[in-house]
Amino acid sequence: MPTGNGRRVAVVAGCRTPFCRAGSVLKHVRAMDLARHAARELLERTNLDGDEIDEVVWGQVVPSPLVPNVGREVSLLPQLPKEIPAYSLNRACASANQAVTNAHDQISIGHADVVLAGGVETLSDVPILVSRGLADILVDASKAKSLTARLGVLSRIRPRHLVPVTPAIAEPSTGMSMGQSAEKMAKENGISREAQDRWALRSHQRAAQGTSDGRLTAEIVPWFPSREGDPIVTADNGIRTDTSLEQMAKLKPVFDRRYGSVTAANSSPLTDGASAVLLMSEEKARALGYEPLAYIRAYAVAAVDPGWQLLQAPVKAVPLALQRAGIQWKELGLIEIHEAFAAQVLSNLKGFEEGLGWEIDEEIINVMGGSIAIGHPFGATGGRLVTTLANEMRRRDVQFGLISVCAQGGMASAVVLERR
């Protein structure tokens, strides 16, 4: 049976900006502007009156100190009443999934009829912190009673104080980065370099096909730049249409240079982008004349010890989501697994197959590629996965679909969608 006993929640529509490698064509665009752009286009595509929206929920992992609540900035679009409440959240790489399931909960219990959910990340513009020493000096200088005293305090600044502190993608509990954890999983689960490269190549080939035939581009909102001379961006720019196993094999490991197997080619790139998803109660969607893409049947979150296998929590979350949905693995017609690393995807699949006894059909998994090729803006990926899966379920008339996302902290999110 579906999660809870409340109202049925429909995924009405979704869209996203192009996902572009950090430091490339979207490097001058603020996260707030990307998020608002995706939301604005979703309202246009659905022709929805802004007065119908009850709440806005947005995921973001690395917010700007200048815009700490990007969700509220989305809700202040001219198309929306200023009275719509909004908030932002962070469940690492599953943030947009969490935004969608939070929206589901509010609708299910009757606190809302229509919720706009999504996520954003601009990894070209992460906050750079000053050193602790420089911060202490600046605080002392601000308390000085005279200019002479202030200059005296500032004279304590040394070159070492000017070295910035960049955000780390490492676990505070273990000190290991995502990539180091992926290396650990590859070794412990017997995932070879060749297997990782083959999965990465598969991701690029399928994403290239999905772009070529229009299935992926249909969900993309073109970005029209405000800076003179910047290009119009209409597609993801991380998809390598001409890559090969031979080219991938030339790359050296990044996280364990001597014995490692995780490379830039079989990992997801740092990415800029935003996604947006429109959710409604089934009754509201019908009343407004919408035909939903899918319905949220169930979801689950789970966690494992980060010191074990950081990105292996899907083996806990997915069975729980299927149990809550009242269905079995073999009933799934399409599956979207977030590709943080090929080593992680293959470890997850091995856990499903050997640990849970499930038969793996790769033909229904990531049928248009995944994050390795398309990109991974941390806070936005979940919205892309919901949109991609729901659209493809409609095209293929698939009854049940699954989203599986690993996340920092040894966490995972799993969502089951249904068509009828």
Set out the residue ranges of the language-model regions.
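Active-site pocket-shaping loop/turn-to-helix segments
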Residues: 17-40, 44, 62-64, 87-101, ...
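Active-site-proximal alpha-helical scaffold in enzymes
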Residues: 90-121, 129, 186-215, 276-283, ...
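Flexible glycine-/small-residue-enriched beta->alpha junction loops
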Residues: 114-184
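Conserved catalytic cysteine-centered active-site region
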Residues: 29, 60-115, 125, 156-161, ...
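N-terminal extracellular/periplasmic Venus flytrap/periplasmic-binding protein-like
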Residues: 16-17, 27-37, 45, 158, ...
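Condensing-enzyme catalytic core mediating Claisen C-C bond formation in acyl metabolism
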Residues: 1-31, 155-162, 167-168, 245-312, ...
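Conserved beta-ketoacyl condensing-enzyme motif
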Residues: 27-115, 119-145, 220-235, 307, ...
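Active-site pocket-lining segment
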Residues: 180-183, 226-227, 297, 304-373
